[in-house]
A protein has these predicted regions:
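Inter-Walker segment of RecA-like/P-loop motor cores
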Residues: 1-30
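Conserved helicase NTPase motor core
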Residues: 23-32, 38-40, 57-58
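Conformational gate/switch positions in structured elements
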Residues: 1-3, 7-8, 34, 75, ...
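Loop/turn-to-beta-strand initiation segments
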Residues: 26-29, 64-71
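Conserved ATPase-coupling elements of RecA-like P-loop NTPase cores
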Residues: 35-54, 75-85
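Catalytic-core regions built around general acid/base machinery
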Residues: 53-63
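Conserved helicase motor core of P-loop NTPases
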Residues: 61-67, 76-196
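Short loop/turn segments at strand-loop or loop-helix junctions that form parts
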Residues: 30-36, 73-75, 106-108
Length: 196
């Protein structure tokens, strides 16, 4: 997104400021996947546009003649850090820009095997959220699935190393309960396993 909607305005001392680019496109549909990650939390001293990515994206797209925006993402994913909801997937927030908004939910999973424990748990959680019955963290079913393995902390580094070697990084996932915990795990994995 940043590469498309921002242009470098000035450059000094290793930092640059970027302003919203001109949208020269006409009658173009801009498609943004993983839109749940788009934040609109204002950043003081931001070097990109207004510091509010969703505001800047919408301003850029709709400044072009006849341009439209398609935002795709999973509303059940964690919202951007510091936000309660993913603003780019929240219909009322988008209507606040004066946009005509259409919302569609896709319910058929095509990228997971049907006997996946991850899929089973994600589907159950999504159903609880849709029924507005998710008042506390539900019990996650972990037994009986080939794609779920519970690993004690002292075995985590060895297990992840083995999984990366056997299955590859793209096929190995660590599930965390928060963005904060995911950042901690990511730093540890980079430092102790990937040596970055």
């Amino acid at each position: 997104i940043h590469k498309k909607i921002y242009r470098q305005q000035s450059f000094s001392n290793e930092t640059g400021n970027f302003s919203i680019n001109d949208n020269l496109a006409t009658h173009t549909l801009f498609i943004v996947d993983e839109a749940s990650m788009i934040s609109n939390e204002g950043l003081s001293g931001a070097m990109f546009g207004t510091g509010r990515l969703l505001d800047d994206l919408i301003q850029f797209v709709y400044s072009g003649t006849g341009c439209r925006l398609l935002l795709m993402g999973d509303t059940a994913q964690l919202p951007p850090v510091g936000e309660e909801l993913s603003p780019a997937l929240f219909t009322d927030a988008l209507k606040g820009y004066g946009l005509e908004v259409r919302e569609v939910d896709l319910t058929q999973v095509v990228r997971q095997v049907q006997d996946s424990g991850i899929l089973w748990n994600a589907t159950r959680l999504r159903e609880l959220i849709a029924e507005d019955e998710c008042y506390s963290l539900p019990k996650i079913r972990i037994s009986g699935f080939a794609d779920i393995k519970v690993v004690p902390g002292e075995e985590l580094i060895d297990t992840l190393t083995a999984c990366y070697e056997r299955d590859g990084m793209d096929e190995t996932i660590v599930v965390c309960r928060s963005n904060k915990r995911a950042n901690i795990y990511n730093k540890g994995i980079r430092a102790q396993i990937l040596y970055r």
